[in-house]
Amino acid sequence: MYYLAKEAIDLGHEANTLYLASYQTAGRGRFQRSFYSPQGGIYMTLHLKPNLPYDKLPSYTLLVAGAVYKAIKNLTLIDVDIKWVNDIYLNNHKIGGILTEAMTSVETGLVTDIIIGVGINFTINDFPQELKEKAASLFKTPAPITRNELIIETWRTFFETPAEELLYLYKKQSF
């Protein structure tokens, strides 16, 4: 998803665009680590154009983590945890991650584009041996909600909830 969003930016596509995938063949996390992303997950990247100095940017990773927590809680009453700085956990197992990248204009010094990638193990039934002890899925099939419902609620929450509340939720659920 990241590469698709980067390509769209290079082609001049509009901001506030959400890119979605059913699976990824080369998903990446922090430090370019591989992110297992088969069918049954939610893989999405949001492109924003803040046009702000770096020191004036909101803490996008923290805000999105707060929004993911609140969206899951609103729809399911499940309390997930947030492992500093960008991982979503359920019962001590990683179920998701958030990756944010900023692009800066050399001419203006402003951050022109932000790409926020979110991956959530929604209904993944089987993990590779090396992940079985660390990773889990939010739900077993059948899930009580749809992937679309969680996608919509996550971004509705991100855009409509005051930043102070999302940061509070982030801090409250962090470990």
Regions found by a protein language model. Give the residues of each.
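N-terminal lobe of the biotin/lipoate ligase/transferase fold
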Residues: 1-78, 96
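Long, positively charged amphipathic alpha-helical accessory segments at protein N-termini or as interdomain linkers
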Residues: 10, 53, 59-79, 90-175
